[in-house]
A protein has these predicted regions:
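Short, surface-exposed charged micro-motifs
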Residues: 154-158, 343, 347, 478
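A glycine- and small-residue-enriched flexible loop/hinge signal that marks low-structured segments
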Residues: 73, 148, 220-398, 428-429, ...
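Generic structural signal for bulky hydrophobic/aromatic residues embedded
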Residues: 149, 171, 232, 357, ...
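Structured, hydrophobic secondary-structure cores that serve as assembly/anchoring elements
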Residues: 1-62, 70-79, 360-498
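Short beta-strand elements
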Residues: 117, 350-352, 479-483
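Short glycine-centered helix-capping/turn motifs at secondary-structure transition points
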Residues: 153, 194, 343, 424-425
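Polar low-complexity, Ser/Thr/Gly/Ala/Asp/Asn-rich disordered segments used for subunit assembly
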Residues: 1-26, 33-37, 42-295, 434-439
């Protein structure tokens, strides 16, 4: 179901001042070309076993889900939901996928009375010839009999042993390709083979090829309860570029975790690697580049989905996180420095003296927020501000353009701000640069540095014009908050006093 974004009425523009509850879940979204993900539907999975039951334990979808649901080592929570969406890079056939046949024996199906199956294929109602399963020798043989009954010029039918399902594909591809649920009055055959909606069958519409941009727009028109996304499919540089452009234009709402398996990032200061030649050259923001296969990209999604926003001091950086089941893919200083010079994150093996550690590095994301945790925090804060204001204005009250109205907005903001302080997204006691203080004070017309130091945040509501009141739009409001950043390295001297 498509919805009107709340940002139509509550528009919050993320911004930063650089040095001289939960209204959104940090779920991960994975793009895949697997046919078993229905076209146009955002599929939710709540465990890796849900994925393997459909796509098998050797599928990249299961391997990614397994890594995702593990979260990061020692996390206080683990991911609760994984989203997947199908990439359609070529015209696709519509299909009908049966309900799960696990536990249904061949003998049971052979005992089903002969009958017909009625469904719609490519817009035309089709009734099969009588299908007799009494002499079937296997589930594959049953698929052949169903295909013959419906007509092999209209459909192809296949038994999927890993998924334990039958799939009936249209013989055509494209937007007009279609196979509907079997009609409820089809009879015993359709019910026994679980081809009806009542028996948990699934339909996927046919589709023309869909661009990366349209794919992502279709996703957010269906589901916005996620922050980071990645592709399990190996995309071309042109397709990756299109996804980078989309993420960069998302107003700091979504981040693209792009993986790179080529050797180019391991050459220091390499202007021809993807990040430098595409991401940096075009100024794309909200891109989290990571060296390695799609499994290494999963670490960013697993990290984000394991953040406990309800925990006191729950904020934690991506750097130093360990991911069980994943081997480090960088173990020498030269490669690590080369990757950093090109803007890539990686999973490293570190050691000095007898101390050894495996952890992710460095957690950098392109754009104004610089670090992945800061990026995720601002998405969470802004989403919760929208949620707070939506609750405020739908609570059967109205708020005028005076101290009472502004106070109500301030009160709604306080709950979000204090939760962010408790979590650690907003930090108190941070000494800002003089340049930062000057920019903020100039914007609000007074010195608020003491408030930012002691409180960590400040809500600025300027005097409203008559035209703003007439439009009923509270304009120019700015929520200042101090991120504070996190310590990720130590440079010091060790001095012996003799």
């Amino acid at each position: 179901m498509s919805t009107i974004p709340l940002s139509l009425d509550f528009s919050i523009t993320p911004n930063v001042v650089s040095p001289a509850g939960s209204a959104v879940d940090a779920n991960g979204l994975m793009l895949t070309d697997n046919e078993l993900i229905p076209v146009g539907a955002v599929q939710s999975y709540y465990s890796s076993s849900d994925v393997s039951a459909l796509m098998g334990s050797d599928s990249k979808e299961f391997l990614a889900a397994q890594q995702y649901f593990n979260g990061y080592d020692n996390s206080s929570v683990i991911p609760g939901e994984l989203l997947m969406y199908r990439l359609v890079t070529a015209d696709a056939a519509g299909y009908l996928l049966s309900g799960n046949m696990k536990g249904v024996t061949l003998a049971t199906l052979k005992a089903t009375p002969a009958g017909t199956i009625k469904l719609v294929v490519d817009g035309t109602v089709v009734t099969s010839t009588s299908i007799d399963l009494s002499a079937a020798t296997s589930f594959t043989d049953i698929a052949d009999k169903v295909e013959t009954g419906i007509g092999d010029t209209k459909v192809s039918v296949e038994w999927l042993p890993i998924a334990n399902r039958f799939i009936i594909r249209s013989a055509t591809t494209g937007a007009d390709s279609q196979v509907s649920f079997a009609y409820a009055d089809s009879g015993a055959i359709a019910t026994a083979l679980k081809l009806t909606e009542a028996t948990a069958a699934t339909v996927s519409p046919g589709s023309d090829a869909v661009s990366m941009t349209d794919t992502m727009n279709n996703v957010i028109n269906t589901n916005q309860n996620w922050i980071l996304f990645q592709a399990l499919t190996e995309l071309t540089d042109e397709q990756k570029t299109e996804l980078c452009a989309w993420a960069s234009a998302s107003h700091n709402r979504y981040g693209y975790v792009v993986h790179d398996t080529s050797a180019a990032p391991t050459v220091a200061n390499n202007a021809s690697c993807f990040v430098q030649s595409v991401v940096v050259a075009n100024g794309y923001e909200n891109i989290f580049p990571i060296y390695g296969s799609y499994l290494y990209a999963v670490t960013a999604l697993a990290y984000a989905a394991s953040i406990d926003f309800a925990r006191t001091n729950g904020r934690i950086s991506f750097k130093f996180r360990g991911f069980s089941g994943l081997a480090p893919n960088v173990s020498d200083l030269a490669t690590a420095q080369a990757l950093k010079s090109n803007g890539y994150n990686f999973y490293g093996s570190y050691s000095l003296n007898k101390t050894m550690a495996q952890y992710a590095s460095d957690g950098a994301i392109t754009g104004k927020f610089v670090w992945l945790d800061s990026f995720i925090d601002q998405v969470w804060i802004n989403a919760n501000l929208v949620g707070a204001y939506a609750n405020l204005f739908t609570a059967n009250q109205s708020y005028p353009f005076n101290a009472n109205g502004y106070g109500a907005v301030q009160a709604a903001t306080i709950d979000v701000a204090e939760q962010a302080v408790t979590f650690g997204a907003i930090q108190r006691g941070v000494v800002l640069d003089n340049a930062q203080i000057r920019i903020v004070n100039t914007s609000v017309g007074k010195d608020i540095s003491a408030t930012l130091y002691s409180q960590g945040w400040y809500l600025f509501i300027p005097t409203q014009t008559g035209s703003a009141r007439l439009a009923r739009d509270l304009q120019g409001v700015i929520f200042y908050w101090v991120d504070g950043q996190l310590i990720q390295s130590i440079t010091m001297s060790s001095t012996a006093i003799l």
